[in-house]
């Protein structure tokens, strides 16, 4: 969110040295798949009211965004009054949000879930009441208003001798409160942590939440997109059903991102199985940017019902593997999907480039097989790949997204006898080695 300071790579470098250990995911009946929807912060910050929120939901229906899966509309910071009531309740702004229950009723009637925002400290990042020491009371208030989703920020942290907890314990307080609310009311919230990647959240986030921020706030420019992709590349193992890395809300339609950069942004977020929260003004979005958000072949990977895991790098490309470089992140990625192996290639250069890989560099490709190639952006079937694939003339900061489907045995008699990594140990049954 909102005013989250830039804590680039804080704790991420530690993660390079040890892969994330998997924790038991919070399987509480909601949040199995990445949330898709809208959050108002990137476009409007504090300049929001209930009319804008409903108008946004209506645009989402008219533009077909609800039809392709964007079914959440979430408030961010600045919806509250600056002071609590005499009995301690948090109070919505009487001018801009005079009736929260009416707002959520309207969103639900339109077919959307409704999301709200709070903070784990004394105040939100914009200076409104935080939920520290009011966790259960606020959670019950949010439930009574009809909300389904809670984004929880990291500002205004109490003194150590007051909180006597680290980041994990601070967020556990609200997780416990949400559990109590579920037991009392039957309402289970999707819980989204906005703790900026602090305290190696990829090791523990899944024990209490459905998503967790891995870095500081995103910006609508390429250097921010590249930096976040770099941070994510080392911790992809943490993502699965019910719990996932969150690289922050989408900036498609904002700032000076080119069309190709916006495609790369969306592709990376979607194929990493991140939440997809639109963050631009839908009243002025271009048809080109809208087409990116509505790419159903990319969305299908994000919402895969069989595999909940993220794509991961199999080769860094420009840099040696495992290089932490915020400007030139990993370029060659792959992952599993219901319908085949997913490949993502990112040209991190400022000029067009050809991008080549051996198929078996991906762990999900079988040796000795050929693969039908589906381009997820041109929506075309592009022949059959045998042993390798080259994407020609990839645009600066551009992306190629492919779905490779097994198409049977490769042609007989191909040399070398073993391709890729296996070539260094290629051995006949009689022990003869072939290099």
Predicted feature residues:
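C-terminal beta-strand-rich structural cap/linker in extracellular carbohydrate-active enzymes
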Residues: 383-435
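Glycan-recognition surfaces
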Residues: 137, 183-184, 188-281
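Fungal secretory targeting signals
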Residues: 1-25
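N-terminal module-boundary/linker segments of secreted carbohydrate-active enzymes
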Residues: 23-54, 59, 178-179, 187-189, ...
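Carbohydrate-binding surface patches
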Residues: 269-272, 277-279, 324-364
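Aromatic-lined carbohydrate-binding/catalytic grooves of carbohydrate-active enzymes
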Residues: 56-161
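Structural recognition of the beta-strand scaffold that forms the well-ordered cores
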Residues: 34-40, 69-76, 113-118, 148-153, ...
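Aromatic-lined carbohydrate-recognition surfaces of secreted/lumenal glycan-active proteins
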Residues: 112-129, 179-201
């Amino acid at each position: 969110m909102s005013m989250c300071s830039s804590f680039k790579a804080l704790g991420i470098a530690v993660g390079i040295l040890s892969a994330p250990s998997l924790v038991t995911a919070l399987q509480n009946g909601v949040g199995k798949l990445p949330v898709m929807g809208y959050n108002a912060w990137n476009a409007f910050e504090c300049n929001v009211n209930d009319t804008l929120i409903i108008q946004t939901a209506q645009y989402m229906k008219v533009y077909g965004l609800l039809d392709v899966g964007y079914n959440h509309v979430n408030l961010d910071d600045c919806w509250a009054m600056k002071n609590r009531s005499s009995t301690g309740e948090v109070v919505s702004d009487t001018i801009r949000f005079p009736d929260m229950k009416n707002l959520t009723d309207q969103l639900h009637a339109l077919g959307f879930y409704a999301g709200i925002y709070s903070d784990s400290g004394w105040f939100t990042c914009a200076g409104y009441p935080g939920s520290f020491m009011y966790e259960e009371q606020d959670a019950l208030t949010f439930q009574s208003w009809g909300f389904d989703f809670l984004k929880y920020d990291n500002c205004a942290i109490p003194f150590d001798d007051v909180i006597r907890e680290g980041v994990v314990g601070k967020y556990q307080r609200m997780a416990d409160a949400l559990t109590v609310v579920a037991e009392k009311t039957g309402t289970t919230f999707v819980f989204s942590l906005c703790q900026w990647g602090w305290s190696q959240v990829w090791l523990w986030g899944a024990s209490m939440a459905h998503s967790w921020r891995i870095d500081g706030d995103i910006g609508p420019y390429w250097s921010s997109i590249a930096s976040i992709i770099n941070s994510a590349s080392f911790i992809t193992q943490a993502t699965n059903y019910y719990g996932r890395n969150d690289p922050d809300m989408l900036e498609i339609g904002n700032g000076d991102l080119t069309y190709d950069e916006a495609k790369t942004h969306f592709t990376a977020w979607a194929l990493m199985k991140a939440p997809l929260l639109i963050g631009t003004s839908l009243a002025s979005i271009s048809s080109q940017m809208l087409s990116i958000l509505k790419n159903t072949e990319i969305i299908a990977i994000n919402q895969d019902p069989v595999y909940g895991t993220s794509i991961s790098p199999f080769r860094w490309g420009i840099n040696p593997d495992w290089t932490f470089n915020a400007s030139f992140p990993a370029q060659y990625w792959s992952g599993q999907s219901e319908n085949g192996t997913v490949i993502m290639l990112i040209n991190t250069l400022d000029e067009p480039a050809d991008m080549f890989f051996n198929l078996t560099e991906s762990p999900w490709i079988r040796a000795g097989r050929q693969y039908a190639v589906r381009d997820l952006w041109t929506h075309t079937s592009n022949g059959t790949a045998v042993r390798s694939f080259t994407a020609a003339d990839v645009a600066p900061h551009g992306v190629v997204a492919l779905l490779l489907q097994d198409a049977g045995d490769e042609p007989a008699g191909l040399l070398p006898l073993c391709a890729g990594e296996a070539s260094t140990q290629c051995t006949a049954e009689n022990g003869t080695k072939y290099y």
